[in-house]
């Protein structure tokens, strides 16, 4: 099995003078002494150390070789100053990580090394040298040390204006490589409130869980160690150097009698291994197999792109051609990908099964926002802005990164004319069963005309709420939504006083029907607004006042949206 890895963000490390280092060392020693005093010297009246860590040691549960959390970066990453990349010997340097999704680039190049027989050399007259790095290469690209690199769309929102790059191409979608693993008893994203997960900062690991939590209405707290607890109702995140190590940390905690982690956000195959070796304590809550919000894109140094547009056009054309060969002729081309990464061909096929390599029409729909079976560039970018919240102080316009002229030029020449958008659900079960637990639930207060099931067309919020529900169905092929209508129970006691339990039962039936009609009105509004939406992916029921969400009657007048995804 391969060791699938994605980028690890570089962390800023301050450099000090020798005197500063001495002072730092003295302060460090002093803090250790103070910590020892607080840990061992301060005891309650029963003589038990107040520190959770100390009590764990006394219970015979030392951390041993458990991975240590990292200090989280406050704010967003800081990149090196922008500079223009200059090709050397007519050869472009491109950096990637060990990921099958970049196989199209490797196929087009005929391997990693500069190749006179590559698609790039034969069709456009330049060569490409592909390097691999375990760390993010945003700074080397920005600073002109790379012509291009691969990153994910969500990261662009975090990097913002300082990232002087052009995005001319979507490489593909991750489909099943990213996964959230949790304690066996956790049934939905909503139930992650007050729990703690291990993750990796500023990559798709963090974005994936932030995206899910934001959609479920669960706020995020960033924790600095395992003994810290999130704010009430929040999901706590503890960061590690990479998502593999985050899963190692969760696996270690599962061996303790009182685990301090409730799960991890990581990458296959490590996530699968954690579940398999947990003795039934852990399970996969969700993967991105049918939740297409992790989209890899090609990032090109902006100064280089402006000076050498023909080379950028060649990169775009070559990667699309490599993607075509891997999609349509995998057997003939998989060997070069396996060799480049040191995989067996069986492992390469397994890794490619977790990737959707994008073609030309899928690219154009991705950037235009018209793709209806996966996340779009603008949609994922804005989801990242919303998910990171206050971390991103001054969000930028996603359009500043995009240049679709290269894709448009290829389409204008009639290239790849036979290709179609072909993103289908990957089914491991017959459908997204409404009998099980939803991935997440979201309460939405649609506005209706008084005492009726007619949506208030004058309320602008209703259109936004419809967009929210449609977004669920768009980014997740094969998923379904259950609309559960609710009304408030404010007058139940009044009905009881007027006519006893008989009147209460009668009015309860009317409330049930009104709530059903309201959920049907939402369903009908969705299918009216989004013509391509399959009505079979929507189900509507009424629950009347049977399931109040709050003592506040206003909050009980709602449509609960339950999202069921295929796994």
Predicted regions: what is each one?
Residues 153-155, 234-342:
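Pocket-lining segment of extracytoplasmic ligand-binding domains
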Residues 2-136, 142, 359-438:
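N-terminal hydrophobic or amphipathic helices and topogenic motifs
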Residues 398-482, 490-506, 532, 554, ...:
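Periplasmic peptidoglycan-binding/tethering modules of Gram-negative envelope proteins
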Residues 477-486, 502-548, 557-567:
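A non-catalytic structural micro-motif
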Residues 50-242, 255-258, 262-268, 285-288:
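Short, glycine-/small- and polar/acidic-enriched structural segments
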Residues 307-394:
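Secondary-structure end/capping motifs
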Residues 103, 107, 139, 143, ...:
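Solvent-exposed, polar/charged alpha-helical surfaces in well-ordered, non-transmembrane soluble domains
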Residues 92-93, 127-128, 166, 194-200, ...:
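Second-shell loop/turn segments in exported
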